[in-house]
Amino acid sequence: MLKIRLTRIGAPKKPCYRIIVTEARSPRDATYTDLVGTYNPMTNPETVVINAEKALYWIGKGAQPTDTVARLLKKAGVVNSN
C-alpha cells in the first residue's frame, strides 16, 4: 500500500520536510517512489509547496495521505475539505 507522507530533511533543530510517495512499511527516511512537494514549518508563515498534478495522480492510484499531509493538501487547496 502506498502512502503520501513526510520525510525529514534539514539541520538539527531546523526541520524541513519533503512530501513523498512511498510504501507504507518503509522507514521514514528510506528511498521514495516520487517527490510531491516540500513543507517548511520554520518560516513565518509556514511554507507549503505541492505539485497538485502529482498529488492528485497518486491519490487516484490509491495512495493514502497521512493526517498531517491531508491537512497540508487542504491548506494548499489541492483537495476539498470534504
From Swiss-Prot:
> Which UniProt keyword terms apply here?
Ribonucleoprotein, Ribosomal protein
Membrane-crossing segments per the record: none
Q: Would you say which domain of life the source belongs to?
A: Bacteria
Cite a GO CC annotation: cytoplasm
| InterPro entries tied to this protein | Ribosomal_bS16, Ribosomal_bS16_CS, Ribosomal_bS16_dom_sf
Keyword Ribonucleoprotein among UniProt keywords? yes
**What GO MF annotations does this protein's record show?**
structural constituent of ribosome
Q: Which PROSITE patterns match?
A: RIBOSOMAL_S16
Give GO BP annotations, semicolon-separated. Answer: translation
- Family (UniProt): Belongs to the bacterial ribosomal protein bS16 family.
The record ties this protein, via PANTHER family, to:
30S RIBOSOMAL PROTEIN S16 (PTHR12919), SMALL RIBOSOMAL SUBUNIT PROTEIN BS16M (PTHR12919:SF20)
Q: What is this protein called?
A: Small ribosomal subunit protein bS16
Q: Lineage of the native species?
A: Bacteria, Bacillati, Chloroflexota, Dehalococcoidia, Dehalococcoidales
